A protein has these predicted regions:
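Conserved alpha-helix/loop element of class I SAM-dependent methyltransferases that forms part
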Residues: 24-43
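Conserved class I S-adenosyl-L-methionine
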Residues: 43-52
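Conserved SAM-binding strand-loop segment of SAM-dependent methyltransferases
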Residues: 86-99
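A short beta-strand submotif of the Rossmann-like class I SAM-dependent methyltransferase core
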Residues: 112-115
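Conserved SAM-binding motif I beta-strand of class I
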Residues: 66-71
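A short acidic, Gly/Pro-enriched loop at the edge of an enzyme's catalytic core
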Residues: 98-109
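Conserved SAM-binding loop of SAM-dependent methyltransferases across substrates and taxa
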Residues: 53-64
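S-adenosyl-L-methionine-dependent methyltransferase catalytic module, highlighting the catalytic core
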Residues: 3-28, 55, 72-79, 83, ...
Length: 249
């Protein structure tokens, strides 16, 4: 698990320009949406489901009076407890969102970023999040898209003989994603609606071109960014890496 923490912390400072851009773009999009959610739903209580290395917890603690970080992994909870030492309004809690013991209708905002792809019953998890929100509360959600080339490459990268080459190219932590439940945008919208949410805003980001990303550096990144601008909102938007939602309970 310490390897996973190391990986998550490395993503935003990666020596690879594409890898760094993909994750920083996602972080910036989530942070922008969290600020909007706090301004809309109020700055009372927020919950982050699956905080991982805790990249969003300091901002949540700035925006909200009371912040709960729930996870099933002790390493992530231990990391959150360290952050709580400097953020007294942060409370880490061991909790499984698929069988949550947190009080119903007790949060103004729930953040769930890059989590439901690890949960087989994502519909059940979304229903649980809806139940934790006060009426009118907001969910900030992100998850990878099923047909993203990056997700396909992530599966290929761990085939026998290939992973050694990939690690040699990146020269930083490379671990299997553990994604077992990748959704298309229509599937994600259907599950959100089935859980009782109304989608207020949505979007996508992230172009990954195999080999271009690994071997052409900043030149390749500029090409990927140019392609992304032309794909967003178009018929090929399902190939972008991450999908984002701001939804009301």
């Amino acid at each position: 698990m310490s390897e996973l923490l190391s990986l998550q912390e490395t993503l935003y400072t990666s020596r690879n320009p594409t890898r760094r851009w993909l994750h920083r773009t996602r972080r910036a999009r989530i942070e922008e949406t969290l600020r909007l959610a706090a301004a809309t739903a109020g700055s009372g209580r927020a919950l982050e489901v699956g905080p991982g290395s805790g990249v969003y917890l300091p901002l949540l603690c700035q925006l909200f009076d009371d912040v709960v970080a729930s996870d099933v992994e002790e390493a992530f909870l231990a990391n959150a407890r360290e952050l709580a030492g400097t953020h007294p309004n942060l409370r880490p809690v061991a909790d499984d969102i698929t069988a949550s013991g947190l009080p119903a209708q007790s949060f103004d905002v729930v953040l769930c970023s890059e989590v439901i792809e690890h949960i087989e019953d994502s519909e059940g998890a979304l229903r649980a999040m809806h139940g934790l929100l006060r009426p009118g509360g907001l969910l900030v959600l992100s998850t990878p898209q099923r047909h993203s080339p990056l997700e396909l490459a992530g599966r290929i990268a761990f085939l026998p003989g290939i992973v050694t080459f990939v690690r040699a190219v990146y020269r930083e932590p490379i671990l299997a994603t553990g994604h077992i439940n990748l959704l298309t945008a229509p599937e994600a919208r259907r599950q959100l609606a089935g859980a009782g949410f109304d989608v207020l805003e949505s979007g996508q980001s992230g172009v990954y071109l195999p080999l271009v990303a690994e071997f052409t550096g900043r030149i390749g990144l500029k090409l990927e960014q140019w392609i992304e601008r032309r794909m967003i909102g178009g018929r090929l938007s399902g190939l972008l890496w991450v999908q984002y939602y701001l939804a009301r309970a």
